[in-house]
């Protein structure tokens, strides 16, 4: 395998680019700003792998590309960012399989029942189907479509879905499009679709023609292989896709790496992913960091002030398997020390998990959030002010964004019930990657070394709420 070439994009690009360069990987298709920052032109050849901020979630990195090269990039980033959670798509995106379908176009891939998008199905029909949507998170559904594609550096050939030419959204010049359409004409006449990737606009025509022929030959071999293949046989590997849920701990590591390239304020990446107002504050903070120190305490003060202005915060509780839950919208009532005081009221009956105590309408639920700490304190009271229990959720560093509080749950928790402190759900530690497990154990030990501090903060929060009545 040649040295992987990687394209990096998004708010983490500078830090990620430095990590990859320092580990001996090559960069490709660099933005002008990134070239200036790192003093590196990058390879003129197109990338094998793209690492970018997710379009859907600024706390996530998306790593996608040719499987072998992508695995190398994932391995490299894991070393530098050990506390983040990787969600590898299964099976590979755009991988292709020989499958047998029934009359309703259903099939089984492994143990999972899948519906295949196809023009015509009958019981026992064998066909080649592409994975057009992989399973990344627990609620994701696998989607397949009849036909397949083969992917090159400059183009993709799509087989079994008609003919024609399509373009990357980054190819906009009409003259370039006309040239690429003419180059694809011969292959399209053979009944296939050509999709030109963004890298095609910079390549020499002869290079593009050679790749089209190479891809067509590969597609022909796949069809020959599929003739005698059994149901479930993979005939094309597709692209590796890894969605990385970045923890605060790794964002801080990326801050340190970025600071070796350009001035970087504390918690740069956490604030940058927190919302537009926070991102604007980062621009100013980085400029100040170029000439003087920006203290972490000042960042915490800024976040608390901003959260108070927000009035309400949604608590987003993420799990290591990728599941995500909203604990509800809480009213910001102020702060005691460095803790935001959030208030909710129960509207129905239920049970407080972990405490094994009945939840009733009118119960007061206080949540105490200390930005960047590794725990949340939840205190529960009945409508008469009697304590039902205290629940301390141990998690990755808490990030307070514009309208939300977010973290990854580390499974183990601490409770105070009937005058006693205890640790619960310790068996959940086995589900954590080793670095996160070590964080969780250390945090539990730290919290249990001064439980009176938890009670003190809760008491101060109650005083604040009482004073506002």
From Swiss-Prot:
Role noted for this protein: Probable RNase involved in rRNA stability through maturation and/or degradation of precursor rRNAs. Binds to RNA in loop regions with AU-rich sequences.
Domain of life: Archaea
Keywords: Endonuclease, Hydrolase, Nuclease, RNA-binding, rRNA processing
Transmembrane segment boundaries: none
EC number: 3.1.26.-
Organism name: Ignicoccus hospitalis (strain KIN4/I / DSM 18386 / JCM 14125)
GO terms assigned for molecular function: mRNA 3'-UTR AU-rich region binding; RNA endonuclease activity, producing 5'-phosphomonoesters
Protein name as it appears in the record: Probable ribonuclease FAU-1
Family, per entry: Belongs to the FAU-1 family.
InterPro entries recorded: DUF402, FomD-like_sf, Ntdp-like, RNA-bd_FAU-1
Keyword set includes Translocase: no
GO terms classed as biological process: rRNA processing
EC class of the enzyme, as a word: hydrolase
């Amino acid at each position: 395998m040649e040295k992987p070439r990687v394209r990096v994009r998004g708010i983490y690009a500078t830090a990620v680019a430095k990590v990859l360069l320092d580990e001996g990987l090559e960069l490709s298709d660099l933005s002008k700003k990134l070239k200036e920052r790192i003093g590196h032109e990058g390879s003129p050849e197109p990338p094998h792998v793209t690492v970018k901020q997710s379009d859907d979630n600024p706390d996530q990195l998306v790593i996608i590309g040719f499987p072998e090269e992508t695995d190398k990039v994932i391995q490299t980033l894991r070393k530098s960012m050990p506390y983040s959670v990787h969600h590898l798509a299964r099976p590979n995106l755009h991988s292709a399989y020989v499958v047998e379908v029934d009359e309703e176009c259903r099939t089984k891939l492994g143990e999972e029942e899948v519906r295949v998008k196809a023009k015509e199905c009958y019981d026992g029909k064998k066909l080649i189907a592409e994975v057009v949507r992989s399973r990344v998170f627990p609620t994701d559904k696998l989607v397949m479509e009849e036909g397949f594609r083969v992917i090159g550096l400059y183009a993709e050939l799509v087989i079994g879905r008609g003919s024609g030419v399509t373009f990357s959204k980054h190819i906009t010049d009409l003259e370039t499009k006309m040239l690429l359409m003419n180059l694809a004409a011969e292959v399209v006449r053979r009944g296939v679709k050509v999709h030109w990737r963004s890298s095609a606009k910079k390549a020499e025509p002869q290079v593009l023609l050679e790749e089209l022929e190479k891809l067509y030959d590969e597609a022909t071999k796949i069809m020959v292989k599929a003739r005698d293949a059994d149901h479930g046989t993979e005939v094309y590997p597709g692209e590796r896709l890894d969605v990385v849920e970045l923890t605060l701990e790794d964002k801080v590591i990326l801050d340190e790496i970025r600071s070796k390239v350009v001035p970087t304020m504390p918690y740069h990446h956490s604030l940058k992913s927190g919302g537009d107002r926070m991102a604007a504050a980062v621009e100013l903070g980085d400029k100040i960091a170029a000439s003087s120190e920006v203290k972490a305490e000042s960042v915490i003060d800024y976040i608390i002030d901003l959260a108070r202005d927000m009035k309400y915060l949604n608590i987003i509780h993420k799990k290591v398997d990728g599941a995500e839950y909203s604990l509800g919208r809480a009213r910001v009532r102020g702060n005691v020390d460095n803790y935001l005081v959030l208030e909710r009221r129960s509207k129905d009956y239920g049970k407080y998990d972990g405490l094994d105590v009945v939840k009733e309408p009118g119960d007061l639920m206080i949540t105490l959030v200390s930005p960047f700490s590794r725990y949340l304190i939840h205190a529960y009271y009945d409508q008469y002010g009697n304590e039902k229990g205290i629940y301390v959720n141990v998690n990755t560093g808490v990030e307070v964004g514009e309208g939300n509080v977010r973290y990854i749950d580390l499974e183990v928790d601490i409770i105070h019930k009937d005058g006693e402190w205890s640790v619960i759900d310790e068996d959940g530690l086995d589900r954590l990657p080793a670095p996160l497990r070590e964080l969780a154990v250390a945090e539990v030990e730290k919290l249990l070394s001064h439980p009176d501090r938890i009670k003190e903060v809760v008491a101060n929060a109650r005083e604040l709420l009482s004073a506002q009545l």
